[in-house]
Regions:
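Fe-S-dependent hydro-lyases/dehydratases of central metabolism
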Residues: 1-389
Length: 389
């Protein structure tokens, strides 16, 4: 049962309360929320900047606002390069941070440099929800809505249901956070959490690193979720402290005795390696059921698994070995910081020496921007998407 105004509040309710401009926290009712931060990617970023110009805005009101160049990286002609120049000039015009091509994917980079527990974030990218891993209220929206938020106007939406997911246990060996969200996709499907915010709580949360939580929050989008919210705890403090940002940390958690509109439990200890078959993220089966299928491409790196560990583990697996004949191993670093760390620790040498192909840090194959497999060939990918287009 959902809490009343005088009842204990879950974390999502606390975040919404702290940013509520108008409306009531009743599912289905329209609410207006103040946005603290804004995130842009380059496909919709140009449209947002044109909207700001049409408004006659002098300077954006959200701080920080960051324009990331992570989609249009292939410069087969002059168009992407000219878009980059336009966006850089627009950032200077409106007081927006600019992250140029090659710096990395917006979501993990934003977490590292700008994410603050308790703040709200709106982004013109569907996977903006990833910032919920830090205890933020992070929402994806269309270009016009994002432009209005940057101009100081509230973001309007209908109050979502809140699904409380209690995490128990811890991940077994060779099971990752990706398996946790794949299990939820198996349960709910790609549209089962529409108009719903997913809030994770319980003893299993502390066993997940912030980058593990990022994986789960990122793929909440594939379930149709409005947002994903994790508490801000000691793991969050550890993540921020490692980046010299411990001053940004605040502890955040659901109040004892709070309720949710919907509830379920996920025991991490019971999970096994899972995989989503073509062509939908919810077509989930155990990996053991398809073991032995021929593989022609393995693609590692996206906003769905951006952490250093994801690449380092693969590097150790291929160390001193050579990839099989006829297989393309594509390595797509999620950020310049991850790439630098892989170089410093010697992991990149193992990846390159085994025959891997190294791509620039960005969205690339996840959005269909390169690395398309041959017709009829199996491509194993860590990206959130496995459907045509």
């Amino acid at each position: 049962m959902i809490a009343t105004s005088s009842s204990p509040l879950n974390l999502t309710q606390q975040l919404i309360r702290d940013h509520l401009v108008s409306g009531e926290m009743s599912p289905g009712k329209e609410i207006a929320l103040r946005m603290d931060q804004a995130l842009l990617q380059d496909v919709l970023g140009a449209l947002v900047m044109l909207e700001l110009e049409a408004m006659g805005l002098d300077r954006v009101h959200t701080e920080p606002t960051v324009q990331y160049i992570d989609h249009g990286l292939i410069q087969a002609d002059n168009l992407n390069a000219e878009t980059h120049l336009f966006l850089k000039s627009a950032c200077e015009r409106f007081g927006v941070w600019y992250s140029g091509p090659g710096n990395g994917i917006s979501h993990p980079v934003h977490m590292e440099f700008f994410g603050v527990p308790g703040q709200s974030l709106v982004g013109c990218d569907s996977h903006t929800t990833a910032a919920g891993s830090l205890g933020m209220l992070a929402l994806g929206a269309g270009g016009i809505e994002v432009a209005m938020a940057m101009a100081g106007e509230p973001l309007y939406l209908n109050m979502p249901n809140i699904l409380g997911i209690r995490l128990e246990g811890c991940l077994p060996d060779w099971v990752s956070a990706k398996d946790a969200i794949l299990e939820l996709l198996r349960r709910h499907g790609v549209s089962g959490c529409k108009d719903t915010i997913l809030e994770y709580y319980g003893p299993g949360v502390s066993s997940l690193s912030v980058m593990d939580r990022h994986v789960v929050a990122n793929l909440g989008t594939e379930m149709g979720a409005t947002a994903t919210v994790f508490p801000s705890d000691e793991e969050t403090l550890r993540f921020l402290s490692a980046r010299g940002r411990e001053a940004d940390w605040v502890p955040l958690a659901a109040e004892p005795g709070c309720g949710y509109d919907l509830e379920e439990t996920l025991n991490l200890s019971n999970l096994e390696p899972l995989i989503a078959l073509p062509s939908s993220p919810d077509k989930v089966v155990p990996v053991r059921e398809i073991a032995g299928e021929p593989l022609h491409q393995a693609y590692i790196g996206s906003s769905g698994n951006p952490g250093y560990r994801d690449f380092a583990v693969v590097a150790e697996m291929v160390r001193g070995r050579t990839i099989a004949e006829g297989v393309s191993l594509d390595v797509n670093p999620s950020s310049r910081q991850v790439l630098t760390a892989l170089i410093r620790e010697g992991h990149l040498e193992h990846l390159v020496s085994c025959g891997a192909r190294l791509h620039q840090a960005g969205c690339n194959g996840c959005i269909g921007m390169g690395q398309a497999p041959a017709v009829g060939r199996n491509s194993l990918r860590t990206v959130p998407r496995n459907f045509p287009g």
